[in-house]
Amino acid sequence: MAAGSASSLGGGSWPGSEAGDFLARYRQVSNKLKKRFLRKPNVAEAGEQFAQLARELRAQECLPYAAWCQLAVARCQQALFHGPGEALALTEAARLFLRQECDARQRLGCPAAYGEPLQAAASALGAAVRLHLELGQPAAAAALCLELAAALRAVGQPAAAAGHFQRAAQLHLPLMPLAALQALGDAASCQLLARDYTGALAVFTRMQRLAREHGGHPVQQPELPQQLPSVPQPSLPGPQPRPVLGSTLPLPLPPDHAPGSVAQSPGTLGAFADVLVRCEVSRVLLLLLLQPPPAKLLPEHAQTLEKYSWEAFDGHGQDSSGQLPEELFLLLQSLVMAAHEKDTEGIKKLQVEMWPLLTAEQNHLLHLVLQETISPSGQGV
């Protein structure tokens, strides 16, 4: 069955004599795995021969055949109860299927074999992810999820890629929150490419909450060593050196650097602050684009829009809890008011001023907000 499937996936990329030679060798190795009376099959030897055949086929650019041989290697490793070997073989098979799909799209401009290699790659990588999780390797599982998501995004399937990015973020979150936030950002970008603006808004909201939780922890100051009591030294005959004044006095510490004190963080630390800025701007633009009715406006979204109303303006050009630069905050505040008043000309002028301050993704959202203001659709663009 596997040989027949491999023949169907080959698509005539192999001359007839060489294809027959491959099938003969594949069947010859497969026959060694059949159970016989009073004879135990040598699974390890068969796995090595399948791996050797896969290397030869890969060198000859026969990618689907090599991938099916790697799947046979994975079955042999499973029979030997060798989880790492099985996961490695499944990963190699998936990469070969993905390479076949990319080559077909580059050469022919269409999916290979009606998208079957892409489905086979997703299935193999999914099995490898489950194995890594069973082995207690969430980082390796997350890396495979990111690899599959990037491949799906590259072949023009951003909606499917977003789910794998979110799964990678879930696996990264306990140990590497910054990597999890980056994966969530990629998921939100994929949802924007797929025009799932409601889903992107939910992801940005979650990103902002996680960035505040993991990026605003105070830093514990190290304990200073306590001074030991001075022991009187026996006096020696002869002149003694004069002690230096102040050499034994402890240096005064600032109030916020006392031993064992907790330094209060002025805000979100490091790269988490950049994540907060991106999420805040993107959420405001998405809310202006979607324009949800008050009955369907979630409390966290209502609080976001309230921060940019004139009533919430504190006179310093920034809200008390925000991380935005003052200029960007004032421009966003003006944009919210202009969108509320349906001021098309005002939005156009603000677009010119905000263009250098936003990313390409955010500038596209701002353009959609302008188009929605000019031609309202009732459900966003």
UniProtKB/Swiss-Prot annotation:
<feature type="compositionally biased region" description="Low complexity">
    <location>
        <begin position="218"/>
        <end position="230"/>
    </location>
</feature>
<keyword id="KW-0963">Cytoplasm</keyword>
<dbReference type="InterPro" id="IPR011990">
    <property type="entry name" value="TPR-like_helical_dom_sf"/>
</dbReference>
<comment type="function">
    <text>RAB5A effector molecule that is involved in vesicular trafficking of early endosomes. Mediates the recruitment of HTT by RAB5A onto early endosomes. The HTT-F8A1/F8A2/F8A3-RAB5A complex stimulates early endosomal interaction with actin filaments and inhibits interaction with microtubules, leading to the reduction of endosome motility.</text>
</comment>
<keyword id="KW-0967">Endosome</keyword>
<feature type="compositionally biased region" description="Pro residues">
    <location>
        <begin position="231"/>
        <end position="242"/>
    </location>
</feature>
<comment type="subunit">
    <text>Interacts with HTT (via C-terminus). Interacts with RAB5A. Found in a complex with F8A1/F8A2/F8A3, HTT and RAB5A; mediates the recruitment of HTT by RAB5A onto early endosomes.</text>
</comment>
<dbReference type="GO" id="GO:0016604">
    <property type="term" value="C:nuclear body"/>
</dbReference>
<feature type="short sequence motif" description="Nuclear localization signal">
    <location>
        <begin position="34"/>
        <end position="36"/>
    </location>
</feature>
<protein>
    <recommendedName>
        <fullName>40-kDa huntingtin-associated protein</fullName>
    </recommendedName>
</protein>
<keyword id="KW-0539">Nucleus</keyword>
<dbReference type="GO" id="GO:1901799">
    <property type="term" value="P:negative regulation of proteasomal protein catabolic process"/>
</dbReference>
<dbReference type="GO" id="GO:0005769">
    <property type="term" value="C:early endosome"/>
</dbReference>
<feature type="modified residue" description="N-acetylalanine">
    <location>
        <position position="2"/>
    </location>
</feature>
<keyword id="KW-0007">Acetylation</keyword>
<dbReference type="GO" id="GO:0099518">
    <property type="term" value="P:vesicle cytoskeletal trafficking"/>
</dbReference>
<feature type="region of interest" description="Disordered">
    <location>
        <begin position="213"/>
        <end position="260"/>
    </location>
</feature>
<dbReference type="InterPro" id="IPR039494">
    <property type="entry name" value="F8A"/>
</dbReference>
